[in-house]
């Protein structure tokens, strides 16, 4: 088993965490003992000064988990039916997170395909979207607010190979329709050659550009 990412890993700026989660594994242990594992290939960063962030300017019951110290989960529901998994980032009370948008299945593919009712012969489409990630890994609101630096809740991250900047593309986030600056912010990060991405060809290629060395650290200052 690879090293589990520590809580301290997540207690940094959302952009840094979103970048460094790419290539890491997201692991879900089911009640049966089976472990489902996927390589993270798409993330989105959110910070409290961002109007599109659920924690922007206020602490609501829905977003309460976002104000915990980085390293716990924030699971919410969209459209009344789909769950989305985030890892809380930064410091206590800040209200920041990274959304896990897509993974490439590594193990437990047949179970994941069954959970999302997809063809197991096409694993790259099993978890290509935030709602599908949660369906494929059986993640729901019962896993909101759990410690992701421990195996206790059956959901955690494992360290993966470090990806070079040349392998990463930045794009605007998907589904953001607030102020123009927020819409244009390149805070969606993708593994360039992945076949499991959630966006359209235009979103993944036409609106994308290669990540620049040290850009993420500079944005976090």
UniProtKB/Swiss-Prot annotation:
Gene3D superfamilies: Methylpurine-DNA glycosylase (MPG). It is an enzyme of class 3 (hydrolase). One of its GO terms (biological process) is base-excision repair. The keyword Hydrolase applies. It holds the Pfam family Pur_DNA_glyco. Keywords: DNA damage, DNA repair, Hydrolase. Its EC number is 3.2.2.-. InterPro entries: Formyl_transferase-like_C_sf (IPR011034), MPG (IPR003180), MPG_sf (IPR036995). Belongs to the DNA glycosylase MPG family. HAMAP family: 3MGH (MF_00527). This is Putative 3-methyladenine DNA glycosylase. It comes from Herpetosiphon aurantiacus (strain ATCC 23779 / DSM 785 / 114-95).
